């Protein structure tokens, strides 16, 4: 399996389960939304299955965008080393990687 395919598998599993394997963050803009909107956005992130080449050039499923209640929402997975000080040297290796999922309003990017 290529690294890109393994990274995609790990990203999809992390994003869909939203438990273990990393951290989840939401920006101030998302946190300021009413709880039902936050919950709906989280479900959309978990169920996201549209990865056009322009958003996902390496096929790793590490970025997504969608509209919710008239606002553009982005989500992004970044890869850090276990100390979370530097980027991961090998995002395909869970022992060397902490995944961080950030959910944000597009205008916060």
Feature names for model-found ranges:
Residues 62-109:
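Short, compact, well-ordered microdomains
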């Amino acid at each position: 399996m290529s690294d890109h395919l393994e990274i995609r598998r790990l990203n999809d599993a992390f994003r869909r389960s939203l438990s273990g394997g990393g951290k989840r963050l939401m920006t101030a803009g998302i946190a300021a939304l009413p709880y039902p909107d936050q919950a709906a956005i989280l479900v959309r992130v978990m169920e996201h299955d549209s990865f056009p080449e322009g958003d996902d050039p390496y096929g790793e499923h590490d970025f997504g965008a969608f509209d919710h209640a008239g606002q553009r929402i982005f989500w992004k997975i970044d890869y850090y080393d276990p100390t979370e000080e530097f980027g991961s040297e090998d995002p395909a290796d869970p022992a060397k990687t902490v995944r961080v999922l950030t959910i944000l309003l597009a205008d916060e990017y």
